């Protein structure tokens, strides 16, 4: 007759040291069968592994909190007043008006909304880059300092109707001027990098009360989600397997219905057709003809590029790096295709020093100024 197995559990203490776990004393519950401990090579590693997964999950999950305001600004597409790619060519019709009324997302340090968080110069018109680790919750306190209703709608993360920030019945879909709303999002496994992705991927957020107009307004930003176990630290969601990262938005801003603050060359347009073309700003991060600055890395740096595409049927872009190649979902290339709504994350090893071109490869987009430079300097 088969003996009856009696199982009981006994609390034991075990000191655990693991790079992505805080040190401390944790309680394990080893299994006893028929009054005898069954510490076999099959049971113990599996049990400890299960417990470590539980501890890791609890240790890494966090709530990331941000304070963001929407504000009216003046934006200059070419602050230098020059074509910095081909100086002898000038800015042509796209330089006859350069400064326009826009709106931007601005990040602040806390709920007083008094001290701005400084952004790298290369971010240009983009709103703050938010970050999360897989499993995190994200809380965004949004203050509308603009003169019209706005919102924040995020791609890729999980939310309910109240927090969609778009056309659902939720109160976050329509934040009136002077009002505030706190968005609650979740970066779960469906928001995190997939099997063919790098250790972090980019998602887009933007205003969605009048989405088309508000994208051209400049109300655009990104959130980067890092795979669990790949962050630099629990309080630093940046991926640990890269040295530098950049985000670039390829978008033709249609300024034909927007107020011009000042003209660039004080010249009248020759025709309505020329005016219409001149107000189409073929920009990378809101700058034209090489006026986007700050894309600099050191030789041998591991660089991640987060690419965003937005716009209409004319916004079919091909981002091209001179001098280097990138790895895109396992494919080696030096050109990445972007459609409106695209969000792509690619990796590069910066090997060759130089002041390289970075541009859209569509011919008339090159002519209209959708180009800049990125620099690789020798290792310091």
Regions found by a protein language model. Give the residues of each.
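N-terminal secretory signal peptides that target proteins for export/translocation
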Residues: 1-41
């Amino acid at each position: 007759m088969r003996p009856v197995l009696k199982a009981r559990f006994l609390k034991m203490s075990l000191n655990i040291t693991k790079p992505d776990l805080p040190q401390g004393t944790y309680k394990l519950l080893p299994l006893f069968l028929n009054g005898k401990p069954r510490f076999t090579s099959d049971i113990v590693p599996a049990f400890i592994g299960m417990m470590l997964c539980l501890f890791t999950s609890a240790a890494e999950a966090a709530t990331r909190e941000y304070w963001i305001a929407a504000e009216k600004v003046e934006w200059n597409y070419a602050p230098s007043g020059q074509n910095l790619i081909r100086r002898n060519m000038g800015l042509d019709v796209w330089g006859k008006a350069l400064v326009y009324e826009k709106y931007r997302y601005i990040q602040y340090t806390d709920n007083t909304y008094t001290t701005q968080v400084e952004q790298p110069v290369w971010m240009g018109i983009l709103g703050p880059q938010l970050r999360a680790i897989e499993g995190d919750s994200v809380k965004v306190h949004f203050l509308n300092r603009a003169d019209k209703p706005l919102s924040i709608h995020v791609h890729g993360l999980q939310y309910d109707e109240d927090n969609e920030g778009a056309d659902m019945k939720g109160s976050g879909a329509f934040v009136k001027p002077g009002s505030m709303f706190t968005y609650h999002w979740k970066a779960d496994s469906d928001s995190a990098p997939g099997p063919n992705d790098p250790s972090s991927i980019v998602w887009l957020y933007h205003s969605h009360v009048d989405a088309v107009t508000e994208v051209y307004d400049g109300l655009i930003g990104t959130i980067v989600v890092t795979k669990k176990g790949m962050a630099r630290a629990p309080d630093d969601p940046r991926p640990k397997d890269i040295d530098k990262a950049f985000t670039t938005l390829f978008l033709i801003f249609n300024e034909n219905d927007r107020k011009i603050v000042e003209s660039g060359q004080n010249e009248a347009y020759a025709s309505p057709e020329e005016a219409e073309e001149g107000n189409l700003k073929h920009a990378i991060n809101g700058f034209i003809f090489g006026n986007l600055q700050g894309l600099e890395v050191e030789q041998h740096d591991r660089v991640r590029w987060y690419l965003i595409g937005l716009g209409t049927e004319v916004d079919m872009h091909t981002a091209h790096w001179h001098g280097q190649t990138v790895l895109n979902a396992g494919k080696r290339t030096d050109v990445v295709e972007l459609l409106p709504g695209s969000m792509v994350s690619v990796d590069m090893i910066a090997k060759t020093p130089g002041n390289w071109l970075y541009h859209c490869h569509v011919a008339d987009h090159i002519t209209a100024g959708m180009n800049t430079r990125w620099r690789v300097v020798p290792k310091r």
